[in-house]
Structures are given as C-alpha cells and as structure tokens.
Amino acid sequence: QLGDPNAMVVATNDDAGPAARIVLLKGYDPRGFVFYTNRLSAKGRQIAAHPRVALVFPWHDMQRQVRVRGIAVPVTDQESDDYFAVRPRGSQLGAAASDQSQPIRDRGEFDARVRDLEARFDGRDIERPDHWGGYRVLPYEIEFWQGRRNRMHDRYLFTSRDGASAALDDGDAWSTVRLQP
C-alpha cells in the first residue's frame, strides 16, 4: 500500500545552496505538475529567484521513484482561487494566518491569529491571500526508477528534445534512454 502517493520533495536553490521539503502534488496536466504554497515562504522566494527546480516522488513501498527537473511558473490567479475555495476551512485559515518561514515568538501567537481570522470571517468565505498560490513545474527531464534485487535497478530517462520544457502528452518532444543502475 502506498502511503501518500502525491507527496513529493521539491528542491529549490538560493545563494546558500539547495533546499528541499515535502509538499503535496495537487494536480497535473500535459503542461506539468502543480502544487500550492505561500509565495513569500522560503521556497516561494527561492523559486522567484531561481525557477529551475527538482521534484522527487519517493514511493519506497513499491521500490519506485520518479524524479523531475523543470521550471516552476505561477499558475493563474483563477487556478489558485479555484483550489483555495475547495480547501478545508482550517487549511484556508492557516494559509491566511501564516507568514510561512518567518520567526514567531510562540505557538500561542499563531493560534491567536487563527482565532482572529475565524471571528473576522465568521459565516463568510475566506478570501485567498494574494501571497498564496500555485506553481506548475514545466518538465524538461523525467527519470523513472524501479528498484530490483542486488541493486540492479531499472532506470529510464526522458529528456525534452530541445532542452526546454515539453508537453507530457507529446511523445515526439521527448527522447528516451535506458540508464545503467
């Protein structure tokens, strides 16, 4: 059984070096892979400065992994609004209350912010904060890895033929090679 199949590592970069964290894949289409976050967070600032990112889907229970390299671009405001509207209310409150990645005195200060927002939006929809939205990772490289006995793994690397991002459903845009374990 696969625990969180949509859990993925997003690796970004800044002047201090690489940074990685787990986020949830919230959608994909022929253009790429979508996740949502606070765009003022460390990852949001890193993406704004260096939009080339890596994703890893670590499916340990199946001895499989998918690795993606691509360019992160903001999704439209409409896509962000639509997704925010279907999030659980508690998640909406948390997104609106959090200055993600910024220091805070203690948990009580954050909890007070959430309570204030609950009171302010009592009986009303919570508006999506301007700083909260999605990114679509436009892939230019995807590797599929399958673990095998004695570390004789199977690996296939798909690379866009022109080196730029390519549509996932355009087979002619991708070249494929088998890699040694």
For each of these PLM feature ranges, what is it?
Residues Q1-P181:
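Binding-site signature for planar aromatic cofactors or substrates
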